[in-house]
Amino acid sequence: MRNLKTYLSVAPVLSTLWFGSLAGLLIEINRFFPDALTFPFFSF
C-alpha cells in the first residue's frame, strides 16, 4: 500500500514537469518559427 501511495504522489509531479517542458518547447519553437509548416532545421 505504501508503494501505491508513493506512485500516486510521484506520477502527477513527473507528468506535470514533462507536459510543462513539452509545452514550453512548443511555445519557443512557435516563437522563433511562427506558422511554419516546414521547419528549416528538419530539411536536409
UniProtKB/Swiss-Prot annotation:
One Pfam family, short name: PSI_PsaJ
Entry annotated with the keyword Oxidoreductase: no
Domain of life according to the entry: Eukaryota
Any one GO cellular component localisation term in the record: photosystem I
UniProt xrefs under InterPro entries: PSI_PsaJ (IPR002615), PSI_PsaJ_sf (IPR036062)
Biological role: May help in the organization of the PsaE and PsaF subunits.
Main subcellular localisation: plastid
Annotated localization: Plastid, Chloroplast thylakoid membrane
Biological source species: Fagopyrum esculentum subsp. ancestrale (Wild buckwheat)
Protein name (record): Photosystem I reaction center subunit IX
Transmembrane segments: 7-27
A Gene Ontology BP annotation from the UniProt entry: photosynthesis
Record-stated family: Belongs to the PsaJ family.
Membrane topology: Single-pass membrane protein
Gene: psaJ
Keyword hit for Membrane: yes
Keyword field: Chloroplast, Membrane, Photosynthesis, Photosystem I, Plastid, Thylakoid, Transmembrane, Transmembrane helix
